[in-house]
């Protein structure tokens, strides 16, 4: 099994060499090199041409009754790192600012143990590309990556949380993370001279009405217990101060703890946009893009076992948490397979996920390996 020092060395290499989603070529090769150092007797690797940077590693069980899968993401973010660390990103404007370097390292640590100590059930470790931007889990699933002996019965995953103490495991039954839907809208009117508004169709006025009206979608259409968020984060329009804009482009995000809530919000957003476009004489282009970012819903059966184990395991610091409005494309896999996702604390409370100063506490790596490894061993006895 990989030592603490080896795990940290691996993590620092991954952190220094981040790659954007669907471009994780060197990451893929590095992972293969590390896996090649493990005992190979019960180990096989599956790749598919449609998602070439993905890796699905299987360890055959000694007396398998099911196949248990662990997922880790691989990709980094288009962020310029500002930590000043000795092992800071070598790649300009690319950074592991969401902890995927930690996730991969924990997965390798777990894999190294079970490669040496054959598990009772079959174990899959899915190194997934493109969590951040291209919903790699859904793409791998849709391409037929999970078939035959590579078809999981249960799926598990973790995500670092800088607001929790290093090594703390946190989860809950039901929804852990929200679903997310990207929104892009264009109002297309007719430009004209600012002095003659009657001869133009002002797209800024139409789009501004949309932005203010859409704030009622959550407050008047979504069950307050379920929660929801509609945020308009980008508004582009106009070419000069004395020209009426003939086009306005809006981008935003929609988030909900339930898929039904997501569908309610998209329905009402579309209705508002169409109504405003009609009232202001605008052509409307509207696009929603959810992909794999469905709510992460922890299955009751597996999560009951997960919580019971973590609460009672020696050396594990565990807590129940409230759901979070962040989105994770494990949501798609959690809707296809039974399973559980959890937080892994990395103790950097001054910096959030996606911060250019994020600096996780590396002591969380070994604690994460031990906690998840112990859980998998216990799960395979049931």
UniProtKB/Swiss-Prot annotation:
Pathway listed: Amino-acid biosynthesis; L-lysine biosynthesis via DAP pathway; LL-2,6-diaminopimelate from (S)-tetrahydrodipicolinate (acetylase route): step 3/3
Class in the EC hierarchy, top level: hydrolase
GO BP terms: diaminopimelate biosynthetic process; lysine biosynthetic process via diaminopimelate
SUPFAM superfamilies xref list: Bacterial exopeptidase dimerisation domain, Zn-dependent exopeptidases
Presence of the UniProt keyword Zinc in the record: no
Catalytic reactions of this protein: N-acetyl-(2S,6S)-2,6-diaminopimelate + H2O = (2S,6S)-2,6-diaminopimelate + acetate
Active site (catalytic residues): 73, 132
Cross-referenced NCBIfam families: amidohydrolases
Family, similarity comment: Belongs to the peptidase M20A family. N-acetyldiaminopimelate deacetylase subfamily.
Protein's UniProt name: N-acetyldiaminopimelate deacetylase
Species: Oenococcus oeni (strain ATCC BAA-331 / PSU-1)
Lineage of the species this protein comes from: Bacteria, Bacillati, Bacillota, Bacilli, Lactobacillales
